[in-house]
């Protein structure tokens, strides 16, 4: 990660204040240095949370949501705010004996502690989420929430996500996609003018809705990818070249990506 690398922190150029928060240790994955290089205006880690509502020694999602809300209550009224938050409550592993599982799997020939604990934790999140959403339902500025995970179901590489806003009542199934397209989807929902790079991603998504490290989904079938197949696929090859330029090229200050 280098200073000025492309990310949604570039919303600062459109007048946004930007906040990154993660209720755990600042040195994990060098997050403190990475967030600083990305240019966030404010960075919050474990010591910046009250730590009054804890689940399995982690800050609960309830407190995490409350802390996000507090940032919106403190912000300047005329200044839009972008918050990137990574929660901690439901992080693995899932065999903490001090935690009381409220969800129990039945009709099994043996006990699977993690099979009970993970859905029990998700249930706690489900109970906290409506209060969070309801706060922004009544918020006096247009607001979008993008909610997704990245740590589960390794065999399927599929996890649920949703994009919610307080200014539209339309519901639609977004279909199968991948995490690299979520930022573009959010910008489109917000009606924010996108850079050429994000416009390119929007075009890629229409032809290849989902991509990950081992393959891609073309809307009909799943394909395992390799260097030869990427080179022979014009869309994938263009994406690979542009992504390489994004990561390794010198485009600081360029409007191509940000």
Where are the regions a protein language model picked out?
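Solvent-exposed soluble domains appended to multi-pass membrane proteins
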Residues: 1-258
